[in-house]
Amino acid sequence: MINTFTYFEPEYLIDKNLIFLYFDFDAFFASVEELENPELVNQPLIVGNRFSRSVVSTCNYVARSYGIRSGMSILKALELCPNAIFAHSNFRNYRKHSKRIFSVIESTFSLKIDVLSVDEGVACFQNISFKKAFLIAKKIKNFVFQNLRIKISIGISDHFLIAKIFSNQAKPFGIKSCSVKDIKKKLWPLPITEIPGIGEKHIDLVFKNNFYKINDLAVCEDASLLKKVFGNFWESLKAVSLGKWYTDNNNQVKSRSFAVSETLEDLNYSNNQLNKKLTQIFDQLFIRLQLSSQVCKGIVVQLKSNDFIVNSHSNKMKKYSNDYRKLLSITKRLFNRLLINTEKNVRLIGISFFDLKKIDTDEGQKKSLFYQFIPKSISKLSEESSLDKLIFDINESFGFEIIKRANKLKS
């Protein structure tokens, strides 16, 4: 019997009748390209570089009808649809549209959205019925499409992660709801891969042990088997299948991780070039950590060689941190340890932060002119972390790099 972990309701959920609306923009990057180039509508559109060894960033639903999916290699996508049209990624433009959409929703419907990524966000309502939540979701969905020409799918639940799962079930351009009391009927029949955190990397092991539906995870009471199949996060996955939350001994909700990876176009990078690329990827991930107002306790670095063999190293710190130099130093140490044992050329570099925790607002933060660039959500940052975030915000506001650290200047 399972008796090694505890279910609980997080402090912010206790004695509160909350319902979450989880917003997920449909094929967002492709939708923005279609919005700005109407001639691309109804054409098989792939966002990515046609002549690179990278992967499909996203694609529209016409391209998906050919079997093309996000994360698929460009070569495979071209095999499936030789006449596909390609658009280069323009992340600054996608962020601009994302900010506008979320801002319009907030101002029009007088609600606060917690923006989770460029194309995902969640709003929380207290003391309303599922029927009322559905009507609100329908109004938002239709308003955004009619006024901004972007399609969104919305999941509704009294459990945050179940709302996320059902936003995916609602695609494209739909609304799906599932209350915790209805999980046996609505959640359990779904494929187990619908639970966030169960990816393709371990799916063979999952299927081999007869976990196909969420129901299979929910009813399993063999803790040793669950740990073998799902690893260190099995308690959290199990809790989601039961519509509950999981806490460790420190009474903290186990958080999702942040990850960024990049497929290299040149397979002949020197170690010095690879370390520079690592720093660029790290900077992207660090910015996400800062914007989410969280600290992390663990880092994973992953390398994929040109023969598609994947290796990784991880480090779990004693204390939570958002210190730029400390996290970068650990990341580089893990990376170079991997390089020593990698005989083939490097094809992909990935970094993830895990075991995340929210940080409180620092009311004593300096209020100088430069600190106005720092979003109010950023809190209790170390001086080093604040400086790096400040540099990013200033450069972002001007549209190009006008400020950089002295140690990054060429001699």
Swiss-Prot record:
Domain UmuC: residue ranges: 20-199
Domain of life where this protein originates: Bacteria
PROSITE patterns in UniProt: UMUC (PS50173)
Pfam family, one: IMS_HHH
Coiled-coil regions listed in the entry: none
GO MF annotation list: damaged DNA binding; DNA-directed DNA polymerase activity
InterPro entries, sorted: DNA/RNA_pol_sf, DNA_pol_Y-fam_lit_finger_sf, DNA_pol_Y-fam_little_finger, DNA_polymerase-Y, DNApol_IV, PolY_HhH_motif, Rev_trsase/Diguanyl_cyclase, UmuC
Gene3D superfamilies assigned: 3.30.70.270, 3.40.1170.60, DNA polymerase, Y-family, little finger domain
Gene Ontology biological process: error-prone translesion synthesis; SOS response
Family matches, as PANTHER family: DNA POLYMERASE KAPPA, DNA REPAIR POLYMERASE UMUC / TRANSFERASE FAMILY MEMBER
Family: Belongs to the DNA polymerase type-Y family.
Protein name stated in the entry: Uncharacterized protein MG360
